[in-house]
Amino acid sequence: MLTDRVLTLLAPALRASGAIVVDATVGLGGHAAAVLTAFPHVRLVGLDRDPDALERSGERLHGLAPGRVELVHAVYDEVAEILDRLGHPVVQGILFDLGVSSLQLDTDDRGFAYSRDAPLDMRMDQTRGRTAADVLNTYDADALTRILREYGEERFARRIAGAIVQARAVTPFATSARLADLVRDAIPAPARRTGGNPAKRTFQALRIEVNAELDVLARALPAAFDALAVSGRLVVLSYHSLEDRLVKRQLRGYAEASVPPDLPVVPEGAGPRLRWLTRGAEPASETEKAENPRAASVRLRAVERTAPNPDHTRKPTGGAS
């Protein structure tokens, strides 16, 4: 199971007395509870941008491990600032479980699910920011085409964007069912019969845009890596190819020497600063996919920090674009 694999990967870094682990996307606290149970001496810092999820996980985790849990309402690219504020500038383990939580998917009025009619919100933090309806009703056709193509990998992006602009001129978008129907009608009939629900890619693109998910992830990974102690471990669970490619690209920058490849001797401090713990991206087992269909798309990558930052710190390659 994925949780068991996460525990196995984190275990060598969390065995030391006083170890601190960060769950950067604590959600309902499933992974966090497993970590706190498996490692009774570990302290956990949990972050989440969703105040509803944080309230629920707080009830669960504070009861499970009194005095060992600190929960903070924050987006995970704020991890360095949060850890400094809490007095934990260096930690032994960090976990990212990306994407939409079960709570968000299963709560109708959040608007994440294209299979149910709901307000077009899609904010992971409903206390701030623009909604999916705001994006649909204010972005021009070119901007809509761009996000559908880049974030949804939608080959009919321009057709869908044009249909959105035309439809909103009559009535602004407010609910998910209307958008799902429009996408289905905008896509050629043969394409509707393959690849699952035709609205899936459009909803993914809007969600990523509303929550700036790839931009946040591109900032969060370097900050998280810098907060890791030497021998500390970072585990990332991604749920679509855009996330996974970004994770791979960012971390690969730390796995390479920061000198020309033909240099005969690598200077001290210029060598790789991590080693991969996973060979490529690990999927969920077939058993887990059968028990939990939402695990079907997961890709797990993990690394161990092997060296501190050099004085001439080189930023990892990659980014959100």
Swiss-Prot record:
Query: Would the keyword S-adenosyl-L-methionine be found if you checked this record's keyword annotation?
Result: yes
Chain spans, region Disordered:
277-321
Residues annotated as binding S-adenosyl-L-methionine: G29, G30, H31, D48, Y76, D97, Q104
Q: What molecular function does GO assign, one term?
A: rRNA (cytosine-N4-)-methyltransferase activity
The terms describing its cellular component in GO are: cytoplasm
**Reactions that this protein is recorded to catalyse:** cytidine(1402) in 16S rRNA + S-adenosyl-L-methionine = N(4)-methylcytidine(1402) in 16S rRNA + S-adenosyl-L-homocysteine + H(+)
Quote the Pfam families the UniProt record gives. Answer: Methyltransf_5
Q: Which organism is it from?
A: Frankia casuarinae (strain DSM 45818 / CECT 9043 / HFP020203 / CcI3)
Q: Which domain of life is it from?
A: Bacteria
**Which GO biological process categories is it annotated with?**
rRNA base methylation
Query: Which Gene3D superfamilies is this protein grouped with?
Result: Putative methyltransferase TM0872, insert domain, Vaccinia Virus protein VP39
State its location(s): Cytoplasm
Instruction: Give a short account of what the protein does.
Output: Specifically methylates the N4 position of cytidine in position 1402 (C1402) of 16S rRNA.
So what EC number does this one have? Answer: 2.1.1.199
- Please state what the protein is called: Ribosomal RNA small subunit methyltransferase H
Q: Zinc-finger: present as a keyword of the record?
A: no
Q: Which UniProt keywords apply?
A: Cytoplasm, Methyltransferase, rRNA processing, S-adenosyl-L-methionine, Transferase
Major location, coarse class?
A: cytoplasm
Name of the gene this protein is made from: rsmH
Cross-referenced PANTHER family: 12S RRNA N4-METHYLCYTIDINE METHYLTRANSFERASE, S-ADENOSYL-METHYLTRANSFERASE MRAW
Q: Which family does it belong to?
A: Belongs to the methyltransferase superfamily. RsmH family.
